[in-house]
């Protein structure tokens, strides 16, 4: 039996699956694990080219999750597939995405924070297997993010830019 040790950076329990969780690593892979099978992982997901700093389960769809990485991108996943559903990256971003959070009110809205101080609010539409639209609002702020119910979000920012239909 081959064992592999990877440094974990983040973990998240899947919504609706209390015995399963996702763990991100410095090696750029995500492991789906079970509390019942502690000696091995259930699935491995590879799609990032650097450390994965955060994983967040979608609060509305139990099989959807989001990751952010040092490779300048956020990726949308379905834990039933081994490759990402989509990748989100600003055209002018050349820095690590260090934090992400889903909106508590909308199933297709999330925010990301980058190492250069920008906060990006992403909105996407996926209908009948086709990506219809992706929009990004970029705010330059400080690091860290937490979105509270009813969109309570305090930020200090210098400028804002909307990038429609990336």
Language model: regions and residue ranges:
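Per-blade loop-tip surfaces of WD-repeat and WD-like beta-propellers in eukaryotic adaptors/scaffolds
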Residues: 1-8, 16-21, 25-50, 58-61, ...
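Loop/turn segments within WD40 beta-propeller blades
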Residues: 10-18, 37, 55-63, 100-107, ...
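Structured C-terminal portions of repeat-based eukaryotic scaffold domains
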Residues: 86, 98, 104-158
């Amino acid at each position: 039996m081959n064992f592999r040790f990877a440094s974990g950076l983040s973990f998240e329990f899947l919504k609706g699956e209390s015995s399963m969780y996702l763990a991100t690593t410095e090696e750029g892979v995500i492991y789906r694990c079970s509390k019942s099978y502690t000696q091995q992982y259930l699935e491995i997901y590879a799609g990032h080219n650097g450390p994965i700093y955060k994983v967040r389960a979608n609060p509305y769809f139990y099989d959807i999750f989001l990751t952010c990485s040092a490779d300048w991108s956020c990726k949308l996943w379905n834990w039933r597939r081994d490759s990402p559903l989509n990748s989100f990256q600003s055209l002018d971003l050349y820095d690590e995405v260090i934090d992400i959070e889903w909106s508590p009110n909308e199933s297709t809205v999330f925010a990301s924070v980058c190492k250069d101080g920008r906060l990006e609010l992403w909105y996407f539409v996926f209908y009948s297997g086709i990506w219809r639209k992706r929009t990004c609002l970029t705010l330059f702020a400080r690091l860290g993010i937490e979105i509270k119910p009813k969109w309570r979000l305090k930020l200090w920012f210098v400028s804002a830019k909307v990038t429609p239909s990336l």
